[in-house]
């Protein structure tokens, strides 16, 4: 373990929830790839990783299970989804509009919907980052990718 290596080397989603639509699965795969490629992930009070993050939903709560590369348990954090639920629902509604617009709307209409989609995604990312601030230090881009994965879990769960 390299002291100060505050990075994720692996992200695992709860597979008991099952698979979703091809669009959602694509978003999941891209978010995991991007998150592993470039992230800042620092469990508060831990000397360093790299880390494996397992995400799951248990009783409508988001569970972050963090281990080191050697399998050593680092922490398990459980968050209520209540503060994120409205943002996630709004995000899914605008994503549906976005995918419909891609098939039938003008480029300017698609761009307007996409700007709204990104704005809602940013709100969700910041909310997640704020909820984790005393547990895990994240940069905003890592929080964005994690929010995408939370949405995938929520959609499938």
Swiss-Prot record:
InterPro entries: UCP032146 (IPR008321). Pfam families: UPF0262. Belongs to the UPF0262 family. HAMAP family: UPF0262. NCBIfam families: PRK02853.1. This is UPF0262 protein Avi_0642. The lineage of its organism: Bacteria, Pseudomonadati, Pseudomonadota, Alphaproteobacteria, Hyphomicrobiales.
């Amino acid at each position: 373990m390299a002291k100060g290596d505050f990075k994720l080397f692996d992200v695992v989603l709860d597979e008991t929830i099952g698979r979703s639509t091809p669009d959602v699965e694509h978003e999941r795969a891209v978010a995991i790839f991007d998150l592993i490629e470039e992230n800042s992930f620092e469990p508060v009070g831990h000397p360093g990783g790299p880390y494996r993050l397992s995400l799951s939903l248990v009783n409508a709560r988001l569970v972050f299970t963090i281990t080191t590369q050697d399998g050593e348990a680092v922490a398990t954090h459980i968050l209520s989804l209540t503060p994120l639920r409205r943002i996630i629902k709004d995000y899914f509604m605008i994503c549906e509009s976005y995918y419909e617009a891609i098939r039938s709307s003008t480029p300017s209409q698609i761009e307007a919907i996409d700007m709204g989609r990104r704005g809602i995604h940013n709100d969700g990312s910041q909310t997640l980052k704020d909820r984790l601030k005393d547990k895990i230090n994240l940069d905003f881009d890592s929080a964005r990718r994690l929010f995408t994965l939370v949405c995938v879990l929520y959609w499938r769960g």
